[in-house]
């Protein structure tokens, strides 16, 4: 399987992958989010990466820019700028194979390449699967917050 930068011609397949996540446990995604606006934004910044298996898109991840998350007080000042990863999606037929971990590691490497000193993320406190995945990477729990009418943990990791 190969990870590569997404292209405009991948849009419909990525959107279909996003839609497959709706209704999954702990997934707050809807028919509106993520959608074409997020894909357009990510493509415009070369920030959307996909994993293919025999030509089929089986996973995706985005490098995110979110001023609301960046403005949280919990982030370590000496580790700025911090980058985010978002919209991690794995095709249901490929779940529980470690693909999300591979995508996150790839995203962390890309953030470092682009000059970010740290990774930071907000994760829904009820999303046990994501929390377990993040433990593998030894992300530090640095705070809690409420955003988008949901409770979140704030995680951070120095990129070195």
Please place each PLM-identified region on the residue numbering.
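Conserved beta-hairpin
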Residues: 47-65
């Amino acid at each position: 399987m190969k990870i590569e930068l997404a292209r405009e011609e991948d849009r419909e397949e990525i959107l279909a992958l996003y839609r497959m996540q709706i209704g999954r446990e702990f997934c707050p995604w809807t028919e509106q989010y993520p959608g074409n606006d997020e894909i357009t934004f990510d493509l415009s910044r070369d920030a959307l990466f996909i994993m293919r298996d025999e030509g089929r898109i089986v996973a995706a991840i985005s490098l995110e820019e979110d001023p609301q998350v960046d403005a949280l007080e919990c982030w370590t000042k000496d580790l700025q700028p911090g980058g985010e990863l978002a919209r991690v999606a794995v095709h249901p037929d490929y779940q529980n194979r470690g693909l999300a971990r591979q995508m996150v590691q790839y995203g962390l490497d890309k953030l470092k390449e682009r000059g970010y000193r740290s990774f930071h993320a907000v994760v829904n406190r009820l999303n046990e699967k994501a929390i377990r995945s993040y433990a593998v990477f030894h992300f530090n729990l640095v705070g809690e917050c409420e955003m988008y009418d949901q409770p979140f943990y704030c995680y951070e990791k120095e990129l070195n």
